[in-house]
Amino acid sequence: MIDQDRIVDGHASGREDQLDRAVRPKRLAEYIGQPAVREQMEIFIGAARLREEALDHTLVFGPPGLGKTTLANIIATEMGGDLKTTSGPVLDKAGDLAALMTNLEAGDVLFIDEIHRLSPVVEEILYPAMEDFQLDIMIGDGPAARSIKLDLPPFTLVGATTRAGLLTSPLRDRFGIVQRLEFYSVQDLTHIVKRSAQLSGVAMEEAGGMEIARRARGTPRIANRLLRRVRDYAEVKGDGVITAAIADSALNMLNVDHHGFDHMDRRLLLALIEKFGGGPVGVDSLAAAISEERDTIEDVLEPYLIQQGFLVRTPRGRMATQNAYNHFGILAPKHLESQQQDSLPGI
């Protein structure tokens, strides 16, 4: 089974949230990358402040580790309100959400992570709260039960999810602002690593930061995690300064190659090439070949490989690309390109 503590996993682990909080930007002016999102949010937040209104409810989605929680914190700071944080799986009962909402003050931001995992009962409570700033709750049981309405102060709900497709239409339609976070460029990640190093008091050369950024899979959380591990290596094996050579040696020791792939990524690609002739192969067969769950392949391993052009999904199954063969120095079959063309819909 997959190692839950993969160093290139975009999900937070252990004390990581606390460590990331120390280097997290607090205002849009400090926010690096995502230029379209930053520009739009500057306008939306500025307009809401001019009108002295709460910002429209905002849905933020994208792969893990790209800064959804960071954006929620920035929204709260820019709007001058407090941030109340929870997550979908924690809100089991309607009363859990009601308790949170009745403590909100005007201008506060309620951040619900993994909002796609809300129970239907809790989701129903959200609808009038989002639309009319009213809370409908039931008091009592059986024939004596009665419904009461509580007025809520104007607030902003920020929902975050890695799987926007699992949101119900009624919930999704109630968000006035929807933002998708994309993978970061190496240039933006280099700036993020440099900023984190300065805030953490880590001595680092520009080339060292760029080497870390190149292998961070377009994800700030991974970049900051790699920075901490390379810092450890530099202090023990070097003079404490992160150079390109130190970063390269440290990341090679951590089994993170120049594309940011770890042993699990390489294992999947090699199985596809060596056991299935490059594909096409069904995801269930591929999962069995590497002893992994289908969901792990689809949600954890595949997205970055597809985004980098090493794997494609076709109606007939998964296929390795020319990039995958080149990565391992394996000669691709001559029919590879035509086979991929034939597997694409409408071709």
UniProtKB/Swiss-Prot annotation:
Mg(2+) binds at T69. It comes from the Bacteria. GO terms for cellular component: cytoplasm; Holliday junction resolvase complex. It is an enzyme of class 3 (hydrolase). DNA binds at R294, R313, R318. The RuvA-RuvB-RuvC complex processes Holliday junction (HJ) DNA during genetic recombination and DNA repair, while the RuvA-RuvB complex plays an important role in the rescue of blocked DNA replication forks via replication fork reversal (RFR). RuvA specifically binds to HJ cruciform DNA, conferring on it an open structure. The RuvB hexamer acts as an ATP-dependent pump, pulling dsDNA into and through the RuvAB complex. RuvB forms 2 homohexamers on either side of HJ DNA bound by 1 or 2 RuvA tetramers; 4 subunits per hexamer contact DNA at a time. Belongs to the RuvB family. HAMAP family: DNA_HJ_migration_RuvB. This is Holliday junction branch migration complex subunit RuvB. It comes from Teredinibacter turnerae (strain ATCC 39867 / T7901). The gene is ruvB.
